[in-house]
Curated annotation (Swiss-Prot):
Pathway info: Amino-acid biosynthesis; L-tryptophan biosynthesis; L-tryptophan from chorismate: step 5/5
Catalytic activity: (1S,2R)-1-C-(indol-3-yl)glycerol 3-phosphate + L-serine = D-glyceraldehyde 3-phosphate + L-tryptophan + H2O
Keywords for this protein: Amino-acid biosynthesis, Aromatic amino acid biosynthesis, Lyase, Tryptophan biosynthesis
Active site, renumbered: 48, 59
Subunit structure: Tetramer of two alpha and two beta chains.
Pfam entry (one): Trp_syntA
Protein name: Tryptophan synthase alpha chain
InterPro entries: Aldolase_TIM (IPR013785), RibuloseP-bd_barrel (IPR011060), Trp_synthase_alpha_AS (IPR018204), Trp_synthase_suA (IPR002028)
Length: 265
């Protein structure tokens, strides 16, 4: 069983998995490492690291700005692996998922990417702009090094595609709770419930819900139906807001993470 799968398997029935997202290299690589430590101390079961990219089309303004900062600072995919490897020196239980876009992986090369990800301690990969129908080659390579391949499901995803995803996805399904980009405002819990039930009829994987979860209240509501709660824009916004005061940044991120993880477990 993979480390990512074990996170869900070992989680008590009524305790939901908490998956915070931060952008790797935002405010510095050392800062990312410290943020990862703070998130774990405050209840993170899985950490999603955003891989810097110049054209993050699926992301809203908060996360897009974080990518702009990291691209400007020259943060590379190799830098992301370095941070994960450092994290693994003291933590062998928290799962790490890389979330990003296809171009940096293609430039790196599928097999070198998979090898470097595995060697650093990455557990899962989510490629936002890679259609499942075109993902089989990368899936085979990731399977070969024991890395889960995670896919997005949107409210607009057709049943036929769900059937196909059941044959290719692993780790968990990332359900996009809103039509739009990350950080969007309105969360329709009835829509979330309906689509989670629809996904469960076809795909036998845990379901994490992201987009639109901003605080402990929205996290609690979503956790009634999902297996995992994914929070990104609110945390990345704190990193941006307190970029000039690392102590306060770490405290604010830790407080929000603790508030969310406590209420869903």
């Amino acid at each position: 069983m993979s480390r990512l799968s074990r996170v869900f398997f070992d989680s008590p029935k009524n305790h939901k998995v908490f998956i915070p997202f931060i952008t790797a290299g935002d405010s510095g690589l050392d800062n990312t490492f410290e943020l990862m430590q703070v998130l774990v101390k405050n209840g993170a079961d899985v950490i999603e690291l955003g891989v810097p990219f110049s054209d993050p089309m699926a992301d809203g303004p908060v996360i897009s700005r974080s990518y702009e900062r990291t691209v400007k600072d020259g943060v590379s995919l190799s830098d992301v692996f370095t941070v994960v490897k450092k994290f693994r020196q003291t933590n062998n239980t928290t799962a790490i998922v890389l979330m990003g876009y296809l171009n940096p992986i293609e430039v790196f090369g599928y097999q070198p990417f998979a090898n470097a990800a595995s060697e650093s301690g990455v557990d899962g990969v989510l490629v936002v702009d890679m259609p499942p129908e075109e993902a089989y080659g990368l899936k085979q390579i990731l399977d070969g090094v024991g890395i889960n391949f995670i896919f997005l499901v949107a409210p607009t995803t057709m049943d036929e595609r769900l059937v196909f995803l059941a044959t290719i996805a692993s780790g968990f399904i990332y359900f996009v709770s809103l039509k739009g980009v990350t950080g969007a405002e309105y969360l329709d819990i009835n829509l979330v419930k309906t689509h989670i039930l629809r996904i469960r009829q076809v795909i036998d994987l845990p379901i994490g819900v992201g987009f639109g979860i901003k605080d402990a209240i929205s996290a609690k509501i979503v956790s009634e139906y999902a297996d995992a709660v994914i929070v990104g824009s609110s945390l990345v916004g704190l990193v941006e807001r307190y970029a000039n005061d690392r102590t306060k940044m770490l405290a604010k991120v830790g407080y929000l993470a603790n508030e969310i993880s406590t209420i869903i477990k």
